[in-house]
Amino acid sequence: MTVTDIILIHGALNRGACYDAVVPLLEARGYRVHAPDLTGHTPGDGGHLSVVDMEHYTRPVADILARAEGQSILLGHSLGGASISWLAQHHPDKVAGLIYLTAVLTAPGITPETFVLPGEPNRGTPHALDLIQPVDEGRGLQADFSRLERLREVFMGDYPGEGMPPAEQFIQTQSTVPFGTPNPMEGRALEIPRLYIEALDDVVIPIAVQRQMQKEFPGPVAVVSLPASHAPYYSMPERLAEAIADFADAPAEYRQTATKAGPDRPAGADGGRADRADLP
């Protein structure tokens, strides 16, 4: 099947509108591009308390996959990495490639919270945890909006405008269902080509954590490195769109050149691929 669609999946506390600058750039490359809200992220859909499980949480994307004429590329940002792993397992024939944008890429059977909570070396997101608090008996997470300047610095250091991005790009409370759900990937899903887009200056998911996840994943991962913090769709939409479209044009080629990564692997050239077999 031919790749016809690219689906951009947001992370925690975000909505699909965060990709507004990227969507038209990918459309100009000839793709149908979607940036849906996951369940609980659209005003009036029941919010975080309505989320039952990952099937329910990712249903808006599954519906797009079902309607697509060909195969789709799935991109997940941050916590959205857990969503694309789930979708790849349950819809492998509809997915041509997976892109993890400074995202959760846990090994099968491992939950995202394993890399969020402090623990072993190259784990933990202390800057993010300092700004997030559990609510509703642990069923939701809220950002501390009384510290807007710090929120912007940590989560949106790439935003080029004054103040905060538009409010419609965010939600108040995030469901914790994705954090506690193990990656279900096995079999066919593990054969789908994967690209990890590193954000070298990210303090939400530090580069050491990004590379530890790549190292522990049971299979090769192609890599592109960007000199960005946690939200490169704000600071460098053109370069991000180029990396996405290049992968979408030939995901099988990336699978052939992908290799294992690790916390000590050198980054690629500024914005370039670092996925060749001769890398240490």
From Swiss-Prot:
Keywords on record: Hydrolase, Serine esterase
Gene3D superfamilies cross-referenced by the UniProt entry: alpha/beta hydrolase
Residues at the active site: D202, H230
Protein name: Pyrethroid hydrolase
Species name: Sphingobium wenxiniae (strain DSM 21828 / CGMCC 1.7748 / JZ-1)
Cited InterPro entries: AB_hydrolase_1 (IPR000073), AB_hydrolase_fold (IPR029058), MES/HNL (IPR045889)
Top-level taxonomic group: Bacteria
GO aspect biological process, one term: jasmonic acid metabolic process
A molecular-function term among this protein's GO annotations: trans-permethrin hydrolase activity
Function of the molecule: Catalyzes the hydrolysis of pyrethroids pesticides. Catalyzes the hydrolysis of cypermethrin to equimolar amounts of cyano-3-phenoxybenzyl alcohol and 2,2-dimethyl-3-(2,2-dichlorovinyl)-cyclopropanecarboxylic acid. Hydrolyzes cis-permethrin at approximately equal rate to trans-permethrin.
Family stated for the protein in its record: Belongs to the AB hydrolase superfamily.
Record field: pH dependence: Optimum pH is 7.5.
Lineage per the UniProt record: Bacteria, Pseudomonadati, Pseudomonadota, Alphaproteobacteria, Sphingomonadales
